[in-house]
Amino acid sequence: MFRGPLDTPWAADVSPSGPRGIKAGRSALLVPILGSIWGAWRPEPGATRYRTLDPMAAVRSSSRLTPFSIQAILNRKEERAHTFPRLATAVSPACCWRIFGESEAEGLGSPCGGAPGAGAGGEPSGWDSDSALSEEGELGRPGDIGERKKQRPLEARAKGEDEEETPGCSDCEIGASVPDPSPPDEDPKCEQLMLEPPKQRKKRSRAAFSHAQVFELERRFNHQRYLSGPERADLAASLKLTETQVKIWFQNRRYKTKRRQMATDLLAAAPAAKKVAVKVLVRDDQRQYHPGEVLHPSLLPLQAPYFYPYYCALPGWTLSAAACSRGTP
């Protein structure tokens, strides 16, 4: 029998023969190693487990293995809360889910969970520690959650006061600030504008030229379509007109002449009517009908009576007359 550091009996059959002896030899090699690991991990009988304020010791302890039991995990969280009291007090019960019906008024009244010096033992039994924020540094700065909770009621109060002060204006001030919703037709100024007749646009008076002036302008235009400045001034002075009147008359005359020329060109470009030679069938000196043939409508010889079934209806139409007309050219 071999006993390890913890006085744990380890049964090892060390007989060298057979497969059982080989397995026993392997177990004999593993027993000292496992025993040394267990001896290093087991705490001393009188020592307090991880109840230290040294942060490095807490970090070292966090790297060790933890038994997979709910009670061990909860104890580990409580130990970390004792190790870092500042972080434990920063966790607000108002941030966690409440499973035992803790009132919202108490959570708002004490957002930080009591005095700053209170430890994890002072936490109410109503909130679940597993539903708190993560322990890996997601809490943020201490006191931020409490400050936000305090600021929310203050902001609500400030908004309520602003809403109360806004409608505090008197009815006169509101009436003065709001424009009159009445339509513009009711305004007296608008009524006056509607009653007044619309102002007609003042037409520019056309210059009335005398026959002598028009004759002289046309003669000069046929001779010279464009006038220079001195020539225009000389012509205006001789006709007792202004230079602007002479200038406008020449412009209008050039425009009319151009339009007439374009119309003439279009008519000239149109294809002329084609003349077709027609054979003359009737001449002026030839007589078409004889005096006795006017009563008879047909001049062609009749071959048989059945070609003309209605010959009996004609007055004076007989076979003898038809036979006589057969010999006419």
UniProtKB/Swiss-Prot annotation:
Organism name: Xenopus laevis (African clawed frog)
SUPFAM superfamilies, alphabetized: Homeodomain-like
Keywords: Developmental protein, DNA-binding, Homeobox, Nucleus
Superkingdom in the source lineage: Eukaryota
Family, as annotated: Belongs to the NK-3 homeobox family.
Residue ranges of the annotated DNA-binding region, renumbered to this chain: 202-261
Induction: By foxf1-B.
Electron transport as UniProt keyword: no
GO terms for biological process, alphabetical: cell differentiation; positive regulation of transcription by RNA polymerase II; regulation of transcription by RNA polymerase II
Biased composition (Gly residues): 110-124
GO CC annotations on file: nucleus
Biased composition (Basic and acidic residues): 138-160
Main location: nucleus
Tissue specificity field: First expressed in developing facial cartilage in early tailbud embryos, with expression localized to the basihyobranchial, palatoquadrate and possibly Meckel's cartilages. Shortly after, a second area of expression is seen in the musculature of the anterior gut. During late embryogenesis, gut expression extends into hindgut tissues. In adults, expressed at a high level in the kidney, pancreas, spleen and stomach and at a slightly lower level in the intestine, skeletal muscle and tongue. Adult heart, liver and lung show little or no expression.
Name of the featured protein: Homeobox protein Nkx-3.2
One of the Pfam families matching this protein, by short name: Homeodomain
Disulfide bridges in this chain: none
